[in-house]
Amino acid sequence: MLYLMSTTVIPHGADGTWMMITVSTDQAREIARDEHVSAVGHQSSADAMSAVLGITVAANRLTVKPEPGDEFLCLRLRRRPPEGVVLNLQQLEAIGFSWALLRYDG
């Protein structure tokens, strides 16, 4: 399964082997076209990801329990936002971000 996430934090209890590669925005758009489940917890993050990826990303506070072979397309901020701040697309772009593809091998 492919999950969309707004963080690269590994879910609790998902010990094992993980692989992470940085992907370009164009690659992220291509990957996001595949069937996926959104695990993006905040509407503002979902809206920003929707704008950048060119697809609808739903806000969905989901606890993910990875299975071997699952992949995660993750938004990676270049630095932490200020405490309690919910970022819009312009603020996200000002901070800077990249994309990572994580794979869980169990």
Feature annotation, model-predicted:
Residues K65-G106:
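Polybasic, proline/glycine-rich intrinsically disordered low-complexity segments
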Residues M5-S6, M19, L53:
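Generic short amphipathic/hydrophobic targeting helices enriched at N-termini
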Residues G16-V37, E83-Q90, I95:
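The transition from N-terminal targeting/processing segments to the mature protein
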Residues D34, S38-P81:
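Acidic, low-complexity, intrinsically disordered interaction modules
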Residues M1-D15:
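Short, extreme N-terminal segment that most often corresponds to the first beta-strand
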Residues T17-M20, A58, L73, A100:
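Intrinsically disordered, low-complexity, compositionally biased regions/tails
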